[in-house]
Amino acid sequence: MENKTKLSDLRPGQQAIIMQFNNNEIFLKLMEMGCLPGEKIVIEQVAPLGDPISVNVLGYSLSLRLNEAEQIIVEIIH
């Protein structure tokens, strides 16, 4: 059973696989950073007010705005 959700719904420490992007602008930005569908992404931190969030992809720490994270569909890894 698939457990797909928006990246913005994950909590620190949760891991997921990037499935798709709902926004081409976000896709191009993240693709330039090496974030592609099929890559593992880990939530590192969430700012106190929920924006931005810090994630780790391919060993790199990236900061994403909440509205960007809402456009990334992931499958949670258990």
Show the residue positions of the predicted features.
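C-terminal regulatory/oligomerization modules of transcriptional regulators
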Residues: M1-L10, H78
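Short, acidic/hydrophobic/Gly-rich beta-strand patch recurrent on exposed beta strands
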Residues: I18-Q20, G34, S54-V57
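Conserved beta-strand/loop element in small beta-rich adapter and peptidoglycan-binding domains
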Residues: C35-I43
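Short alpha-helix capping/helix-loop boundary micro-motifs
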Residues: E2-N3, E25-K29, K40
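Short, structured beta-strand/loop micro-motifs enriched in basic residues and often containing a Trp
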Residues: G13-I26, P37
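C-terminal structural segments of small proteins and small subunits
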Residues: G13, G50-H78
